[in-house]
Amino acid sequence: MFNEYFGGGMNGIVFQELRESRGLAYSAFADYSTTKRKEKQTNYAYTYIISQNDKMMDCIRVFNNILDTMPQSQAAFELAQQAAVKRIASQRITKANIIFSYLGNKRIGINYDLRRDIYAAMPKLTLEDIVKFEHDNMANKSWLYIILGDENNLDMKSLEKIAPVKRVATEEIFTF
């Protein structure tokens, strides 16, 4: 539900703020995920923002602001809630995904389809729950940035103010 509201699709807060409201990005997406391990629960968030080089620092500034003070919209929340419920209701686990789903659930100590619990909890969630989750898990945290682009066209001085910059050759990224 959080991903649907925050970063998923064209109605997500990240897309709306960076693309629709401000016109800073061609595309923007964010996701919060957990690993399926009972013994060691690891949570992580990732995003991608595709923009012009000259808008990069504006995108970083706006995205950090979204993370620290997430915009709240009851209308967007209701759309996200409806979309999440419909997605679970229409989603089917088939073919090889049957075993992968079973093994994933087994790793976290359950022997049934976890989506059943999520589906039942969905109507009870409120916008305040989403805001609290975001505040507790994402606001005011340190982030790792990966910037792809021609260094000659990027504002490297501004990037260096955010964090130390590590330059990586194309061959280190694409090893084939």
Model-derived features: where do they sit?
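A common structural junction motif
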Residues: 22, 65-72, 160-171
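Proteolytic maturation boundary segments
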Residues: 15, 127-176
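M16 family metallopeptidases and their MPP-like homologs
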Residues: 2-4, 15-69, 75-127, 135, ...
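Structured mid-domain segments that build the active-site/substrate or prosthetic-cofactor binding neighborhood
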Residues: 8
